[in-house]
């Protein structure tokens, strides 16, 4: 069905369509006066490289949401294939208080938790916020980066985790 009428697209049809898109998987973390919190997200996107800016969409009904707003900082930790269990834990299978118990966590500039071994970590300050439907679009200035090389990326598509192998360096 093709329709340009926004009322003709149900929430369930939209969610089903979005489930077909492959997305990188991230742990979005924060720490500060609002407490330490984290969640799994796939709605992350580059905005600009001058200055380095990205966006992340967070559900305002998430138990972690108030901490992000109060702290004003976050780290987007892009996951490798080895982190599938963490992605599930941070998606709500484990209570907020227990999510940081497992792996090693560090800090960069903002103080938000940085996952050791993440494919890349974007340490950010929230500089703007837009309410759209059930979510907030957070515009984030990237203040520091941490990255590793050679790891396979974790993707989410069709409601399942998938692995994107690294390109063979000889075929580049």
Curated annotation (Swiss-Prot):
Taxonomy, superkingdom: Bacteria
One Pfam match: Flavin_Reduct
Reaction catalyzed: FMNH2 + NAD(+) = FMN + NADH + 2 H(+)
InterPro entries, per the entry: Flavin_Rdtase-like_dom, NADH-dep_flavin_reductase, RutF, Split_barrel_FMN-bd
Entry EC number(s): 1.5.1.42
HAMAP family assigned to the protein according to its UniProt record, in alphabetical order: RutF
Biological role: Catalyzes the reduction of FMN to FMNH2 which is used to reduce pyrimidine by RutA via the Rut pathway.
The protein, known as: FMN reductase (NADH) RutF 2
